Each structure stands twice: as structure tokens, then as C-alpha cells.
């Protein structure tokens, strides 16, 4: 799209490019024919195009999505959850599965056969919306190189656009810019500055950035622009944007952001995940939503039962692709992508760049841009002060109490415990000792997990204990400190755990209780500390010397979790209900 092409200047010129299969339509007065979310006539099978609601400012002049008169209900998640550690029905050997009501096992999912789609005679759709603002145009090559160097941005691809220094450079609609301003952001994060122009140009994109880097808005705001330029949903149409996420926690958080910005843009969204009743999710899909955020297993359930389809999807996001492969979701991802038109725009996001993710990207993406923030190797955030303490297992709890007395001032503290049983035990004892602690793990019902997260986010219960279910994708602001009560099974999980603090440029602190049983991780842990500019305690160095070759053996390299492997577990094994969050506080309030 050339810089002089003003294709968004008026509704009529937009309508003629809308890709209607039966010629162009005459301009329609929205008041003349009320919008029906279940059916829209005219304009071919997809219904008429959105009509601009006023003269939007900005160089791109994006057409505003026209919501139905009288409003609509926003997608919502369900209540009671199932069992298992993760938010999908991913059991049967790789990771403990979270079944929920009406779910299937992972083995059953692998046997599901979705209908083969016919992608002949595809209707054209618009996906290039980017015009450089004068500020970006004025940047010299030296300016661009300096900006990227200062923010540790590296790029690959053909005709890579310059980064955006200010939110106004993206020329998002005014309502989106107002929402950004209310959140108090002063400038785009590095992944947003480079990712927005790439996404708005309509090209496929690979984004490599650590959690907490602002990547959700890096793909979500261009998605809203994309939706606004497409014809309205017609009867039985599926979504225009599909966002796949590995866990229900991450999916719910993406939905919160989508709802926050989508309401201002008149774009509907819903969240589809396991461990919650299907009824409300099915109603949202049948009502019609432009954006679906989903975990792979529950989405395949919905596709198999024909509660929705992906024929209208032209903007696909794979969030935390490395995590989805870790959890064994590759077969489900492939089945889902096979239902989507091949000329879609695809955005793949990952914290690391292992060979499996690279292979997936090579098969699913065409001529992509690549934006890397920092390194493709998993590294600890340098803004986090890491403190490693050698603590014998029997002394862990007393050491935790000492830390809490030093740290607790009402700020949020996240404590990671390796097992669900251990998580409940620590939480129960903390509450009996008067500390405001709540636990979250896979044996908690979905409604209880939602309640615990809400209490923790609001600060009403500033101490939360968790298993690794919360280690990836959990977006809680202002976590002062992370405590690794138990060292995790992989160094990858260690980095993701401590990454819950020190987000968005803030400083953070992480305490880790390290035992002699964890000695195999000592050598690589020292490397992580050194790479992040942290002090290596003499006791840890001594443990490395005493443990011989250390973790990784003679093969060399950092040994992270093998793809598709991991902890065993069943699916939907209905254990006795976890009651640690209901233990009364004992004694006096301790802070």
C-alpha cells in the first residue's frame, strides 16, 4: 500500500474494496436496516461492510466497526472447573490434564477428525492498513539503528518497517489511544514499537519476547483494526480473529484485554477454554463474536460439535507457541490451522526459539517478519534481583516466615511450591499462622481459581501460593517478590517463575530455596545468575564444585524440558476437594 493511497478516506471507496462476492453495494444508512447479529442481508454471503461512524483522525483513517443497535453481550467464561493441572484437557501422559465438564482426554482429541475444508474461490480480504506517520518517516537509518540497539531489538525479513516511537505513530482509532492513555503508558514497549507496524502491514510475524514485554497488545490492537476493515459477520459465521493460548489462565487474561479495548471499538470477543461449562461459551459463539480466544482442546470440541467454524478467520495468533508445544498441543494446533484459509495473516509469539517452534513457523507462516527482543535463548530478566539460599528442606517454612516478616508491607508476594499437596500444606499453615495467603493449582475449581486471582490482583489477599500452573502467562501487576519455596523441575520453569516480578521495566526480587537435592541444577543456575549480572553466592559455587560435572552432563548446553514430555498425570481424576483456602486465620494479623 503506497503512502499516497487514501483508501480509507470515505465509506464508498472502502465498500468497493470490501471483497463482496457479488459486485459493490450502494452506501447503506445504518438506521435504515437494523443490524441483526445472527443474519445480515446484502453484500453477498458475508453481509454488508461496516460503515464509518464519523471522521476518524489519523493518517490511516481506519473505518470504525459499527456495533448493533442496543448493544450486545460480551463473551464470558464459565463457572465450575474440572481437575488436573492445566487449563485444557491435556492429560493422558504428557501433562496433568484439566478435564472440566463435558471434556475429552487428550488421546480422544488426537483421534478427532475435522472436515476437510475447500479453499477454492476465496473472497479477497484487506489486511494492509499501514501508512508511516511523518514522525516515523523522518527517522534516518541511523536513528532506527540507535533506537533498536538501545532497546535490544533485532529484526529479520524483507522490507522491514521502521519502529514507532510514540503511540500516535500507529494511528490507532481515537478510542484506542484514549484507552492507552488512561492506562498510564508513556511509550510503546520494544515489541510493540516494532511489532505494530509489522502487523499493520498485513504480513506474517514472528515475535520473540519474554513474558511481561507487552506482546498481548502488540497483536491485539492490530487485530481490532483488522476486524474493523472486514465485512460484518453473517448468519452462522465464525470469528474473524482467532487467538490460541496454552492455558486457561492466559486465555482469560487475553480476553480481559480484548474486552477492555474491544468495547471501545465495538468488537465482541469470547474466551473458550476447558474446565468451565460449555453452555455459556456455546451461546457466545452462536450469538456471533469477532474475536475468539481459545485453548486448543476446547476449541476442537466446539469445532467437532459444529458450534462454530473458522471459515471467516483471516487473522490467526499463536501465543506462547513454545509452551503449547511443551504441553503436547502440536497435533491439535495442526488440526485447527487446517480449518483456516491459507492466505490468512498469522502471528506467532514465543519466549524462546527452539527447533520445534522454528519448524512450526516455517510450515504455518509465509514470508514473515521476525522481531526479537533480547535473545532467542531463555534468559533471566536483569531487572530482577535474584537471591539463592541453600536451605535444608525441614527449615524452609521457618525461613519463609522470616522472609515474610521482612518483606510484607501489603505488597504482592507469589510463592511457588512444586506439588499441589505441598501448595495446600504451605497455604494452610500460613493461614493458621495469621498470614493472608490463598492457593491456586489444578485441583482447585475454576470458580475458586478465579476468586483467588481476583483477591490477589486486588491486593485483598497479597500472598498467593501456586504450582507452575501460574508460572506462564500470569499477568498480575506490582508483584513485589517471588519466592521459590521448591526449586522447579527445569531451569526453564525457574526463569518463567521469577519473571512474574520485574515486569514492564519495574524492579523485582526473587528468593529461591535451594537444597542439596537440587544440586544437578547448580552449574546452569550459576550461568543464569552470571548472564543476568547477579551475585553468585559462595555456597552455590561450593555446591557446583562438590557435585562434579553438574547438570547437563557431557552433552553440553542447557537442558530444558524435552518437547512433548514432562510430568505424567491422568485426566479428570476426581480427587477430594482442596480446602486450604478455607482454613480460618489463626492468631493475630501478622502485618
Curated annotation (Swiss-Prot):
The keyword Methyltransferase does not apply. Its EC number is 3.6.4.13. It catalyses: ATP + H2O = ADP + phosphate + H(+). GO terms for biological process: nuclear-transcribed mRNA catabolic process, nonsense-mediated decay; rRNA processing. It is found in: Nucleus. A motif (DEAD box) lies at residues 319-322. ATP binds at residues 209-216. It comes from the Eukaryota. Residues 399-544 form the Helicase C-terminal domain. Belongs to the DEAD box helicase family. DDX5/DBP2 subfamily. ATP-dependent RNA helicase involved nonsense-mediated mRNA decay and ribosome biogenesis through rRNA processing. This is DEAD-box ATP-dependent RNA helicase 30. It comes from Arabidopsis thaliana (Mouse-ear cress). The lineage of its organism: Eukaryota, Viridiplantae, Streptophyta, Embryophyta, Tracheophyta.
Amino acid at each position: 500500500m503506497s503512502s499516497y493511497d487514501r483508501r480509507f478516506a470515505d465509506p464508498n471507496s472502502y465498500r468497493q474494496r470490501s471483497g463482496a462476492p457479488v459486485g459493490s453495494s450502494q452506501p447503506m444508512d445504518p438506521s435504515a436496516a437494523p443490524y441483526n447479529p445472527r443474519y445480515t442481508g446484502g453484500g453477498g454471503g458475508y453481509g454488508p461492510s461496516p460503515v464509518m461512524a464519523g471522521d476518524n483522525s489519523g493518517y490511516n483513517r481506519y473505518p470504525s466497526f459499527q456495533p448493533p443497535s442496543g448493544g450486545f453481550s460480551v463473551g464470558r467464561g464459565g463457572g465450575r472447573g474440572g481437575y488436573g493441572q492445566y487449563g485444557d484437557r491435556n492429560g493422558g501422559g504428557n501433562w496433568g490434564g484439566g478435564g472440566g465438564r463435558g471434556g475429552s482426554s487428550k488421546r480422544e482429541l488426537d483421534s478427532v477428525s475435522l472436515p476437510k475444508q475447500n479453499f477454492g474461490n476465496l473472497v479477497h480480504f484487506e489486511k494492509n492498513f499501514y501508512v508511516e506517520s511523518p514522525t516515523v518517516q523522518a527517522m534516518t537509518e541511523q536513528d532506527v539503528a540507535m533506537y533498536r540497539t538501545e532497546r535490544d531489538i533485532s529484526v529479520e525479513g524483507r522490507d522491514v518497517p521502521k519502529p514507532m516511537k510514540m503511540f500516535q505513530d500507529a494511528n490507532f482509532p481515537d478510542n484506542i489511544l484514549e484507552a492507552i492513555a488512561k492506562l498510564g503508558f508513556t511509550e510503546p514497549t520494544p515489541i510493540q514499537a516494532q511489532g505494530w507496524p509489522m502487523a499493520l502491514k498485513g504480513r506474517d510475524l514472528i515475535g520473540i519476547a519474554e513474558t511481561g514485554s507487552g506482546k498481548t497488545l502488540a497483536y491485539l490492537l492490530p487485530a481490532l483494526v483488522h476486524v474493523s476493515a472486514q465485512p460484518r459477520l453473517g448468519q452462522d459465521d465464525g470469528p474473524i480473529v482467532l487467538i490460541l493460548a496454552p492455558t486457561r489462565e492466559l486465555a482469560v487474561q487475553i480476553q480481559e484485554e480484548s474486552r477492555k479495548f474491544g468495547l471501545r471499538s465495538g468488537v465482541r470477543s469470547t474466551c473458550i477454554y476447558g474446565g468451565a461449562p460449555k453452555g455459556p461459551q456455546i451461546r457466545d459463539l452462536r450469538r456471533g463474536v469477532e474475536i475468539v480466544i481459545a485453548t486448543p482442546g476446547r476449541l476442537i470440541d466446539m469445532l467437532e460439535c459444529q458450534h462454530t467454524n473458522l471459515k471467516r478467520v483471516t487473522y490467526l495468533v499463536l501465543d506462547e507457541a513454545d509452551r503449547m508445544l511443551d504441553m503436547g498441543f502440536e497435533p491439535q494446533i495442526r488440526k485447527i490451522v487446517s480449518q483456516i484459509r491459507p492466505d490468512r495473516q498469522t502471528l506467532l509469539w514465543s519466549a524462546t526459539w527452539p527447533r520445534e517452534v522454528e519448524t512450526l513457523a516455517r510450515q504455518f507462516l509465509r514470508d514473515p517478519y521476525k522481531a526479537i527482543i533480547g535473545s532467542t535463548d531463555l534468559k533471566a530478566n536483569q531487572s530482577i534481583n535474584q537471591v539463592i539460599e541453600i536451605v535444608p528442606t525441614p527449615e524452609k517454612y521457618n525461613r519463609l516466615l522470616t522472609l515474610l516478616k521482612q518483606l510484607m508491607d501489603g505488597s504482592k508476594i507469589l510463592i511457588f511450591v512444586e506439588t499441589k499437596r505441598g501448595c495446600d500444606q504451605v497455604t494452610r499453615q500460613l493461614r493458621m499462622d495469621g498470614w493472608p495467603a490463598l492457593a491456586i493449582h489444578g485441583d482447585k475449581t475454576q470458580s475458586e481459581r478465579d476468586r483467588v486471582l481476583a483477591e490477589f490482583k486486588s491486593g485483598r489477599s497479597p500472598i498467593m501460593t501456586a504450582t507452575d500452573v501460574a508460572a506462564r502467562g500470569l499477568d498480575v501487576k506490582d508483584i513485589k517478590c517471588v519466592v521459590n519455596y521448591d526449586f522447579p523441575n527445569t531451569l526453564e520453569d525457574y526463569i518463567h517463575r521469577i519473571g512474574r516480578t520485574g515486569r514492564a521495566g519495574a524492579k523485582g526480587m526473587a528468593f529461591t530455596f535451594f537444597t542439596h537435592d537440587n544440586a544437578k541444577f547448580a552449574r546452569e543456575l550459576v550461568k543464569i545468575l552470571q548472564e543476568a549480572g547477579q551475585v553468585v553466592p559462595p555456597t552455590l559455587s561450593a555446591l557446583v564444585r562438590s557435585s562434579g560435572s553438574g547438570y547437563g552432563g557431557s552433552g553440553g548446553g542447557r537442558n530444558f524440558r524435552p518437547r512433548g514430555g514432562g510430568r505424567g498425570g491422568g485426566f479428570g481424576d476426581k480427587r477430594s476437594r482442596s480446602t486450604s483456602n478455607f482454613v480460618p486465620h489463626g492468631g493475630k494479623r501478622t502485618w
